[in-house]
Amino acid sequence: MSKTILVMAGGTGGHIFPALAVAHKLRDAGWRVVWLGNPEGMEARLVPQHGFEMVWIKFSALRGKGILRKLLLPVNLLRGFWQGLKAIRQVKPNVVLGMGGYITFPGGMMAALTGVPLVLHEQNSVAGLANRVLASVADRIVTGFPDVIKNGTWVGNPVRPEIAAIAAPAERFAERTGALRLLVIGGSLGAQVLNEMVPQAMALLGESDQPQIVHQAGEKHIEALKANYAAVGVQAHCVSFVEDMAGAYEWADLVICRAGALTIAELAAAGVASILVPFPHAVDDHQTGNAKFLVHAGGAFLLPQTELTPDAIALIRNYSRSQLLEMAEKARSLAKPDATEAVAQICSEIAK
């Protein structure tokens, strides 16, 4: 008889995509996979596309400003716990896996209360509030970065198989000549500061220093981005979404991007040099911590948004392809290509 896992993840792609990788791995191994999500969250749109059974819980973030949110917190918690308990009784999982987002808190607490084995995966270098609380009741804790939570095991963040399968940096760079290849990733929302600063920086470069540019900006910002490049007379391939992320990493010599946990894992798995601009308003400034993982190993440059200027970005004129290859290899040395398998294996080991 096949076993059942209840996967809890929601809110952002950084939680959902790694959880999907594990969910697919377990389903391929014969497991029944059920997903606990918020009907108003990103997971409600993404997860059903992969054919997973859903159960729903309406639960809002524990953090937040405003007197009304604080007054309603007890009601929010009680409702969340009740719905979490109802989901566990309905699904009858052999193990529960929390992959991040506030949605994991009520389900995780009810798993512990009912004696269902609970595995937590923390993607970021600084543990989120839900995982910090749940860590005291979890049976196993695994992390995307080293030394995040006491008693946690560093397994890395699951990435898409096609990214983990990219050829080694030395092999990719072997026949590469001509202009440097610059990939700018703004994310699904488009990082407006990158959309404004990078075109201005490229305008400061001489013709011989001008890289080939692929710039992803998010659907809402694509026309403004094209106008920014046109205004400074710089050619760039502007896209709202990168369909083939593995192909984009494989093509690039250098990536400019934010420092979300999944992005860091992909940069390491692909083995590509990067300039990391952490999102300054991330909870607990966790993106700076994420970035330092690659920076301290020599695989990336850290450029805080407060120091982000066209002149600072234009310093890429000083980077040689051989230097970027060396950085790419250092980034690749930190990769955890078996992260998906490791999380799935731990779930299998402790399932009742």
UniProtKB/Swiss-Prot annotation:
Positions that bind UDP-N-acetyl-alpha-D-glucosamine: T12, G13, G14, N124, R160, S188, Q287
Entry-linked InterPro entries: GlcNAc_MurG (IPR006009), Glyco_trans_28_C (IPR007235), GlycoTrans_28_N (IPR004276)
Catalysed reactions listed for this entry: di-trans,octa-cis-undecaprenyl diphospho-N-acetyl-alpha-D-muramoyl-L-alanyl-D-glutamyl-meso-2,6-diaminopimeloyl-D-alanyl-D-alanine + UDP-N-acetyl-alpha-D-glucosamine = di-trans,octa-cis-undecaprenyl diphospho-[N-acetyl-alpha-D-glucosaminyl-(1->4)]-N-acetyl-alpha-D-muramoyl-L-alanyl-D-glutamyl-meso-2,6-diaminopimeloyl-D-alanyl-D-alanine + UDP + H(+)
Pathway as given in its UniProt record: Cell wall biogenesis; peptidoglycan biosynthesis
Signal peptide positions on this chain: none
EC class: transferase
Lineage top rank: taxon: Bacteria
Keyword Ribosomal protein: no
Family: Belongs to the glycosyltransferase 28 family. MurG subfamily.
Role according to the record: Cell wall formation. Catalyzes the transfer of a GlcNAc subunit on undecaprenyl-pyrophosphoryl-MurNAc-pentapeptide (lipid intermediate I) to form undecaprenyl-pyrophosphoryl-MurNAc-(pentapeptide)GlcNAc (lipid intermediate II).
Name of the molecule in the record: UDP-N-acetylglucosamine--N-acetylmuramyl-(pentapeptide) pyrophosphoryl-undecaprenol N-acetylglucosamine transferase
MF GO annotations: UDP-N-acetyl-D-glucosamine:N-acetylmuramoyl-L-alanyl-D-glutamyl-meso-2,6-diaminopimelyl-D-alanyl-D-alanine-diphosphoundecaprenol 4-beta-N-acetylglucosaminlytransferase activity; undecaprenyldiphospho-muramoylpentapeptide beta-N-acetylglucosaminyltransferase activity
Keyword Transferase attributed: yes
Pfam short name (any one): Glyco_tran_28_C
HAMAP family: MurG (MF_00033)
Lineage: Bacteria, Pseudomonadati, Pseudomonadota, Betaproteobacteria, Rhodocyclales
CDD domains the record matches: GT28_MurG (cd03785)
UniProt organism field: Dechloromonas aromatica (strain RCB)
Subcellular location: Cell inner membrane
Entry membrane topology: Peripheral membrane protein
Keywords annotated in UniProt: Cell cycle, Cell division, Cell inner membrane, Cell membrane, Cell shape, Cell wall biogenesis/degradation, Glycosyltransferase, Membrane, Peptidoglycan synthesis, Transferase
E.C. number(s) listed in UniProt: 2.4.1.227
Cellular component GO terms, alphabetical: plasma membrane
One Gene Ontology term from the biological process aspect of the record: lipid glycosylation
Predominant localisation class: membrane
